[in-house]
């Protein structure tokens, strides 16, 4: 039976570097329910301690997906409607290696149909390098060889190049990536069926490169804490099983579209130099020869510029069979902008909780709940802020060189 669901497949547990200690199975389940996400990746399957925790706390549904054992479900999770969160085994590998005379740094996400397959994969990876200290292990393993290994260990596995445009750690990144997926994966490139667009690009930017036409475009949060789940996600209408997910990612059947950041909000949209506070469009950066006008050092090339380099279609090109996508701003950010307090403040958090308790999940509020209902619960300004996000009537100040961009919901002039 087909089931409409929101899926976030690339996330991290507390065992990855620079992550929240809140990243436990129970907290991930709680936040997924709160946000209205039906399916999440486990993240970090390579980490032995995390894998043992997953075996203890998750139970298999017999179809390649898992759910939290009932005794671990938090009391406050039970108030949300639906059947609870499904988990799919997932992890990310950071590959750093030399190829064709250059140092390459590429992140790849792997999805697997079972924790047993994760055991087998981890066993092989452990022979390459240290998988104990970081949930996203850094290995001197060519992406091609990683894919070859996965296909050997588990032919039903899925490898998705992660946030493909990020300057420093991605397959097409300006700093240490390649100029094509084929150059990276060589004769195994036909086994790559999907690409993760990352926070700083959206599907429309990717449509400009005809070589990417054959790939499904997926979006995930890459969340380093449970509250960041669903910053980006996939809209699915699939049989609720690993097989259904596999078909959606590998063929597009049942992949209805994605939920996106406004790409300008991503940390690497424009060219720039964070230390000097310099942010430049691709045209401006070209005029300066890619050099920072303040300190004279090389600028970090942003995603917008890198797409421009590889594009063979004009800006604004719409792919005929391109999937729909919606650009959203996380609800706490909307409330924060409307109230003038930080997202962590008691006032913003109180309003967020009130909206969730009264109107439903975060995705429902951002996407579906009528403006009038939002207005009567949280006031006119927040209702208007959400409406502006829905219609794209926002001002975008692009992020650059690791600095998040800003989305302004109101024209205050």
Predicted regions, residues:
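An N-terminally biased module of ancient metal coordination in phosphate/nucleic-acid-related enzymes
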Residues: 1-95, 100-103, 394-395, 404-409
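Divalent metal-coordination and catalytic microenvironments
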Residues: 10, 44, 87, 110, ...
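Short acidic/histidine-rich active-site segments
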Residues: 214-230
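Low-complexity, acidic/Ser/Thr- and charged residue-rich accessory regions of DNA metabolism proteins
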Residues: 335, 340-413
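Histidine-centered divalent metal-coordination motifs
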Residues: 10-14, 163, 224
């Amino acid at each position: 039976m087909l089931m409409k669901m929101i899926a976030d497949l690339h996330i991290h547990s507390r065992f990855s570097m620079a992550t929240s200690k809140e990243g436990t199975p129970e907290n991930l389940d709680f936040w997924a329910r709160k946000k209205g996400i039906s399916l999440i990746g486990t993240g970090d399957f390579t980490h032995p301690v995390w894998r043992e925790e997953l075996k203890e706390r998750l139970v298999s549904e017999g179809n390649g997906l898992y759910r939290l054992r009932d005794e671990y479900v938090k009391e406050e999770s039970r108030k949300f409607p639906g059947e609870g969160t499904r988990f799919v085994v997932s992890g990310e590998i950071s590959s750093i290696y030399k190829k064709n005379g250059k140092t390459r740094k590429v992140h790849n996400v792997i999805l697997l149909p079972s924790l047993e397959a994760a055991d087998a994969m981890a066993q092989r990876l452990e022979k390459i390098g240290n998988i104990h200290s970081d949930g996203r292990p850094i290995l001197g393993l060519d992406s091609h060889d990683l894919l070859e290994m996965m296909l050997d260990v588990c032919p039903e596995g899925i490898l998705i190049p992660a946030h493909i445009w990020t300057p420093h750690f991605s397959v097409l990144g300006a700093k240490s990536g390649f100029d094509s997926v084929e150059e990276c994966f060589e004769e195994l490139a036909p086994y790559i069926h999907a690409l993760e667009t990352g926070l700083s690009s959206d599907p429309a930017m990717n449509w400009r490169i005809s070589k990417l036409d054959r790939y499904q475009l997926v979006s995930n949060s890459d969340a380093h804490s449970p509250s960041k789940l669903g910053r980006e996600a996939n809209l699915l209408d699939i049989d609720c099983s690993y097989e259904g997910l596999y078909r959606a990612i590998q063929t597009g059947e049942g992949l209805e579209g994605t939920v996106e950041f406004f790409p300008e909000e991503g940390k690497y949209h424009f060219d720039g130099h964070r230390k000097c506070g310099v942010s430049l469009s691709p045209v401006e950066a070209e005029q300066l020869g890619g050099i920072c006008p303040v300190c004279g050092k090389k600028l970090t090339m942003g995603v917008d510029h890198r797409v421009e380099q590889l594009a063979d279609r004009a800006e604004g090109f719409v792919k005929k069979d391109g999937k729909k996508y919606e650009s959203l701003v996380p609800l706490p950010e909307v409330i924060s902008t409307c109230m003038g307090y930080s997202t962590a403040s008691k006032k913003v958090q109180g309003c967020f909780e009130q909206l969730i308790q009264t109107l439903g999940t975060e995705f429902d509020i951002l996407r579906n709940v009528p403006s009038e209902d939002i207005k009567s619960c949280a006031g006119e300004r927040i209702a208007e802020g959400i409406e502006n996000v829905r219609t794209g009537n926002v001002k975008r100040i692009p992020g650059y060189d690791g600095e998040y961009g800003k989305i302004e919901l109101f024209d205050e002039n």
